[in-house]
Each structure stands twice: as C-alpha cells, then as structure tokens.
C-alpha cells in the first residue's frame, strides 16, 4: 500500500510474510497465492505491499536462477503485489516447532549471514517496482547478547563493512539503492537505539549510506524506550532509519496479581522467545529471556508493569487484565511520518505470532488468518491517514 506524505514523497506500507514461514521458492509462491493476494482483495486495493521473508534455500534458488527470479517478479505483478522491503532477520527454520534462540544464528560473526544478506540485496534490487529505486532489508542486530569479545566484534563490523561495499557496487550496477537496518531486539548485543548508535558510530563501523537501523515498535516498547528519545538518538548520530516495523508488545500493568499472571501464562508458548522486561521506579530495566522464566520465581519484580516480546495483533488488544502497547506504536508512527518530512519511507506490519496466540484468539484456517492480517493493515492505514497521509495507488 502506498501513501502520499504531505511533503509529496511516497511512504510504503506492507505486511511481513514471515507469518507464513515458507522455506523454499515453491512455498513462497504458495504464500502469494493463498494469503497475500487474498489480503489485497479484502482491502479492496489494486496493489498491496508485502515484506517478503526469504529463507536461505529460497534466496539461493533465486540468486542462482535468473529465470526463476523473473518469474517471481512477474507473479508478484500479476497478483497485484509489490516488494520494496525484505525481512532478513530469520535465516531459516522460522516455522519450526521450537525456534527460540535459533533465530539468532548465523549471526554477523559468521560468513553465512553476510552471504545471505548479500543474496537478499541482489534479489530485492531485481524485485523493486519499476518506479522505485530504494529498497530496505532488516537484519539481526549483530548477535545474541553472549559477549562477543573483541575478535568477534571486529569480525561482525568487518562483515557489515563488506556488505556496505557490496551494496555500493549493486547501486552502481543496478541504479537501485538497497539499505540494510540492524533491528534492535531485547536480549541481543544491540537491544536499544543507544546500543545501535554505539555500534554504528564505533571505529571501523560501515558507512551510514547503506547501513542503518530498523525500528521495531514492539521491541522499543518491551525495552521501555521512549520513541522520541530513541529516534532522536539515531538522528543526532546521523544513523538512517531505513525501515520501521509496526508491532505491539504484550503489557501487564499489575503482574503481582494472580489473575494477571494466569492470563500471561496463556502466551508462554514453546515456539518463540518472549523476552520479558520491567522498569523499576528508578528507571532500571530488568528482565528475563523468556516469559516462562518471568512467571516462575525468577526474581523479576512484580511491583511495576511487565512488557513481553510477544507481537500481538495491532487491531485486537488482548482481553483484560492484559493490554498491548499500541500507545507506543502510535507515538513512534507520529514521530516517524507525522512531521514535515518522513523519517522513513518503509513501514511493515510484523505480527508473526498469529499461530501461537492463545487458542481463543488464534485463527484456525487460512481465511481467518487473511482476515486478521487485512484488519491489521486497515488499522495501520487509519493511523497513517489520521496523520495526514493520503492513500495512493501504485
């Protein structure tokens, strides 16, 4: 979906297809047919933006087969779909029964991460619409927080530098500018905007021409970051926000109550990691690596609100006594695109947890899932039009 900002520029809104974790190219094409096109039809749009997730095997196929890449581009066009952004964070296996910490491998100290991201950039340059010259890719924020050590930290920065050089060559050869954004996430080496600034302004850091940050509003909320402060931190350091992921975290205002913890327990599922945080009265953020840890006697204080890294549908907050952090989403979006110029032009709704919601809220067939995704996009659309942006067809 495209929107015209009051300054005349185009802002793109998409939904991320990692909610349909296809591992190979046939699976990707099935996603377009069974989900993405039906979502577009539900919204009554001639064109819908999607943020493709391409697992390792699908990406390797497309890079190695120009005919397959052209066919995918043609199918996107025929189904009324367009791609200006990719989710490059999960490498493969995102549909596994247990993902948890596996999603952080390979990290930026490993060659596979660099090669995969390079492949994604080449693919995106070929998939961009004819009238679009800028693409974005979100990626792992270096690594899980296990201390990198100086040698591994140097290797990660070196890999990002090589990527920046490759993106410059791609830009010169294709005329398309592909930028990659580290996506700060609770529990990782880069958890916050301040962490990202520290990494991307350190000696040996890559040029900001092609390497920046992807802001995820669920992650900001989970870490109790103030959106304005986070954005100011990046802008003051000259770090571009190449993309923003529109998402909401799970919020428990009074976790000391038994009924609240019982409600939270319904979200403590085995597939994904649900980092949980609280902020003490003196502003210190404490947390656990997973919700289940917080619910047992983990030492996490119950005297202040908890927030959990569980992406809940934007339009459908959980039932009381729980809530979601759409207030953080609204504040971030107002700052990102509500000013005189947009601070990013790529927005992506990312709720990959539909299949792991409590049973009463979970869509039990493809039709209901498409309904839910369309409702989320309609919610995001309304937020944008309330900020003065106007819908525009491709």
Model-derived features: positions:
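Acidic/histidine-rich catalytic cores of soluble enzymes
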Residues: 167-292, 303, 312
